[in-house]
UniProtKB/Swiss-Prot annotation:
Coiled-coil ranges per UniProt: none
This protein's record includes keyword Zinc: yes
Protein name, UniProt field: Zinc metalloprotease Rip1
First-tier enzyme category under EC: hydrolase
InterPro entries in alphabetical order: PDZ, PDZ_6, PDZ_sf, Pept_M50_Zn, Peptidase_M50
Pfam family, any one: Peptidase_M50
Organism: Mycobacterium bovis (strain BCG / Pasteur 1173P2)
Gene Ontology CC terms, in alphabetical order: plasma membrane
Impact when changing H21A: Does not restore cording to deletion mutants
GO biological process: proteolysis
Amino acid sequence: MMFVTGIVLFALAILISVALHECGHMWVARRTGMKVRRYFVGFGPTLWSTRRGETEYGVKAVPLGGFCDIAGMTPVEELDPDERDRAMYKQATWKRVAVLFAGPGMNLAICLVLIYAIALVWGLPNLHPPTRAVIGETGCVAQEVSQGKLEQCTGPGPAALAGIRSGDVVVKVGDTPVSSFDEMAAAVRKSHGSVPIVVERDGTAIVTYVDIESTQRWIPNGQGGELQPATVGAIGVGAARVGPVRYGVFSAMPATFAFTGDLTVEVGKALAALPTKVGALVRAIGGGQRDPQTPISVVGASIIGGDTVDHGLWVAFWFFLAQLNLILATINLLPLLPFDGGHIAVAVFERIRNMVRSARGKVAAAPVNYLKLLPATYVVLVLVVGYMLLTVTADLVNPIRLFQ
């Protein structure tokens, strides 16, 4: 029951985020003298609407977004006589840019508010964990009897028996230098027998011989990344974990901006990698293992939201919503039509072009002909809609689950 409740709550939170995005456009458009014809939440048939002043407000049947209809957003629109002087495309560049940025800006504001609240209540995670092979804990070596499921074991493991402690930094496994925990684990998996391992402890290099223990682990087979059971070496160590840091009312402010900046970099990397994830999504639809690093749709996001609520992980619920708003802001600022960033790029281009013409003693040129940009816009739309359908299908037939 809580899982379904979580799905509904997260879907509602997404809808509110989109509604606030459009509200940002509407509020700034009004403040700068433009006419807002309609403000609707959802698409499709109208369920309810009312008119206040010159704006019609309403709710439509399909709760998958919303829109804010500003008069004269492009020169190709039909305008009523009272709209001609207030048409958006005729306004000063700074006004147009302000209106267009207000939507993504609202999503960014939501992200900042949520991250600030998380910093106060739960603390912020460290996006830059230790890059060295720092040992966090030692223990026995358990067999992975099935994917993600370890059998019970007791007693010290090979690392502990050899004298390796929590806080030690592994720098070499046999003849292989390692600079991260993943590199260390990979080197151990390939080893067997008694292997010299070099660790740094309090600035001193210590060589200790560790008896590598054979065990079963599920690892990628190298052909499409499918996980398969394999016999590998293990020494019974875990990576050092850096817990979240809680902040006060004032210290949380710079921490929020710093964390959001780091998160934006990660979001940018993820967006740049989208084309490389198509194959993994297709394999997931065909019944293969779903890569948790593949992108998700609104459907997948709501399922993850349901998982977080079902297990009482409200911090994950709000953090995921903050991250989603940051993604919405970032995508909408891409300088491609039909995104807000594409319209901003057109407005800035017109401004620079007319400044150059003015410097040459020429009059301002006509606004950009959006009809000539339609082919490029349609290409972007086809790619975006196609990718959305791919992710929705993958989320329906093979969703990413936090707990299974």
